[in-house]
Regions:
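Active-site-proximal beta-strand elements of phosphoester/diester hydrolases
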Residues: 1-10, 14, 107-109, 137-146, ...
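Hydrophobic residues at beta-strand termini and immediately following loops
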Residues: 6, 108, 132, 196, ...
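Cys-nucleophile CN-hydrolase/nitrilase-fold catalytic domain and related Cys-dependent amidase chemistry
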Residues: 15, 24-101, 106, 171-185
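Short, acidic/polar
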Residues: 16-26, 148-154
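CN hydrolase (nitrilase-like) catalytic-core segments centered on the catalytic cysteine
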Residues: 57-76, 148-229
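Short beta-strand scaffold segments in enzyme catalytic cores
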Residues: 77-79, 94-98, 130, 195, ...
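Active-site catalytic loop in hydrolytic enzyme cores
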Residues: 87-159, 173-180, 243-250
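Binuclear metal-dependent phosphoesterase catalytic core
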Residues: 219-245
Length: 257
C-alpha cells in the first residue's frame, strides 16, 4: 500500500480553494492508495465559527466520497463540520474522516479539544476511539492535541492498530514537541505513525509542517520539506511490523489500566 501525506498551505476559510488544491494532488498521485490531509484542511483552525462558515457533515462526506471514487484513492483528514445529529451542543465537531473508494465512510470526532485556543467553546468533543480496518491494515484516527495524551493513543487488545494517523495544525513554536511526540508514540506502541501538519499562516500562528511517516523503531520513513507545501510517500511493510512485534513483544507487558 502506498500512502501519501499532503503538507498543505491551507487557504483561510476558503473551502473551494482547498478542495481544488486537494484534487490537484490526487490528479498528480495516480498510484497512491491513501492520501492523508491536515487538520481542518478546508478552513484552517477556526475555533469559534460564525454562521455559514462551516459545511454540514453530509456535504463534506459527499465531496470526499466523490473524490475517493473518482481517483480510486482513500482520503483521511480533519474537517470542521456542523452536525445536527450530535446529542450535545454546540452541534459542531472537529471530525477526522477516513473515506474509501469502495464507499465506506468512517469518522472520529476529536476527543481532546484544545482548551488554550478556545476549541472547546466552538465544538463538542468525541468520546470514542476509532480504528479503521482497510485492505488488511488497522488505522487509529487521531487529531492534533490528542498526540499529547499517550493513554488515549495506547495500543491495547480492545483498540489494536498498525498505523496511528495524527492530522494537525501544530504551530511552529512547538515544533520540537511535535517531532518528539510522534516518535515517542511510534516507539511505545510498536506502530507506524503518520503525522500530517499544515504550513503557512493563520490569524494566530505560523506553521512549518514536519509532516512525516515514522517506523516503529522511531526513525523516519518519509518527510516533507520543512516550511514547503508538498507531498511525501511511503509503503508500510506489514510483514516486518508483525515480525518485530513477535520477536520483541513489549505490548504484551503493557499496563492494563
Amino acid at each position: 500500500m502506498k500512502i501519501s501525506l499532503f503538507q498543505q498551505d491551507i487557504a483561510w476559510l476558503d473551502p473551494n480553494a482547498n478542495y481544488q488544491k486537494i484534487e490537484r494532488v490526487l490528479q498528480d498521485s495516480p498510484d497512491t492508495d491513501l492520501l492523508v490531509l491536515p487538520e481542518m484542511c478546508t478552513t484552517g483552525f477556526i475555533t469559534l465559527p460564525g454562521e455559514g462558515q462551516l459545511e454540514s457533515a453530509a456535504a463534506v462526506e459527499q465531496k470526499l466520497l466523490a473524490l475517493a471514487q473518482k481517483y480510486g484513492t482513500a482520503l483521511c483528514g480533519s474537517f470542521a463540520v456542523n452536525d445536527d445529529t450530535l446529542p450535545s451542543t454546540p452541534q459542531r465537531a472537529n471530525r477526522c474522516y477516513f473515506v474509501t473508494p469502495e464507499g465506506d465512510i468512517h469518522h472520529y470526532d476529536k476527543h481532546h479539544l484544545y482548551t488554550p485556543g478556545g476549541e472547546g467553546l466552538g465544538y463538542s468533543a468525541g468520546h470514542d476511539k476509532v480504528m479503521v480496518l482497510w485492505r488488511g491494515i488497522r488505522f487509529l484516527l487521531t487529531v492534533c492535541y490528542d498526540l499529547r495524551f499517550p493513554l488515549w493513543l495506547r495500543y491495547d487488545h480492545e483498540h489494536p492498530y498498525d498505523i496511528l494517523i495524527c492530522v494537525a495544525n501544530w504551530p511552529e513554536q512547538r515544533q520540537l514537541a511535535w517531532d518528539t511526540l510522534l516518535r515517542a508514540r511510534a516507539i511505545e506502541n510498536q506502530s507506524f505513525v503518520i503525522g500530517v501538519n499544515r504550513i503557512g499562516q493563520d490569524q494566530m500562528c505560523s506553521y512549518q509542517g514536519g509532516t512525516c511517516a515514522i517506523h516503529p523503531y522511531g526513525h523516519y520513513l518519509a518527510q516533507c520539506t520543512l516550511g514547503q507545501e508538498g507531498v511525501c510517500s511511503f509503503e508500510p511493510d506489514m510483514q516486518k511490523l508483525n515480525e518485530f512485534r513477535q520477536k520483541f513483544p513489549v505490548l504484551s507487558d503493557a499496563d492494563v489500566d
